[in-house]
Curated annotation (Swiss-Prot):
<keyword id="KW-0408">Iron</keyword>
<comment type="function">
    <text>Could be a mediator in iron transactions between iron acquisition and iron-requiring processes, such as synthesis and/or repair of Fe-S clusters in biosynthetic enzymes.</text>
</comment>
<dbReference type="InterPro" id="IPR007457">
    <property type="entry name" value="Fe_traffick_prot_YggX"/>
</dbReference>
<comment type="similarity">
    <text>Belongs to the Fe(2+)-trafficking protein family.</text>
</comment>
<dbReference type="InterPro" id="IPR036766">
    <property type="entry name" value="Fe_traffick_prot_YggX_sf"/>
</dbReference>
<protein>
    <recommendedName>
        <fullName>Probable Fe(2+)-trafficking protein</fullName>
    </recommendedName>
</protein>
<dbReference type="GO" id="GO:0005829">
    <property type="term" value="C:cytosol"/>
</dbReference>
<dbReference type="GO" id="GO:0034599">
    <property type="term" value="P:cellular response to oxidative stress"/>
</dbReference>
<dbReference type="Pfam" id="PF04362">
    <property type="entry name" value="Iron_traffic"/>
</dbReference>
<dbReference type="GO" id="GO:0005506">
    <property type="term" value="F:iron ion binding"/>
</dbReference>
């Protein structure tokens, strides 16, 4: 049976994640309050950030930037798109 939660990002009941996707307390917070659908939306947004800003994941500053953007996206007011960004769908 799939675990259901009230997703903090979506503001509605949704399927929960099957495992903690991130280490530490933040990972537990994500596991307990963020749905699979919201997590997938974050992964897509994260990919866009990595590509648009040409981030190297071996750079500690890039990882710190992505972690802060993840917190903003999942729990805050949202993560901003890079200036001038337009998706292929638009």
């Amino acid at each position: 049976m799939t675990r259901r939660i009230i997703c903090q990002k979506l503001g509605k009941e949704a399927d929960a994640l099957n495992y903690s996707p991130y280490p530490g307390e933040l990972g537990e917070r994500i596991y307990n309050h963020i749905s699979e659908q919201a997590w997938q939306a974050w992964l897509s947004h994260q990919t866009m950030l990595i590509n648009e800003y040409r981030l190297s994941l071996i750079d500690p500053k890039a990882r710190q930037f992505l972690e802060q953007e993840m917190i903003n996206f999942l729990f805050g007011t949202g993560s901003e798109k890079p200036a001038g960004y337009t998706s292929e769908k638009e």
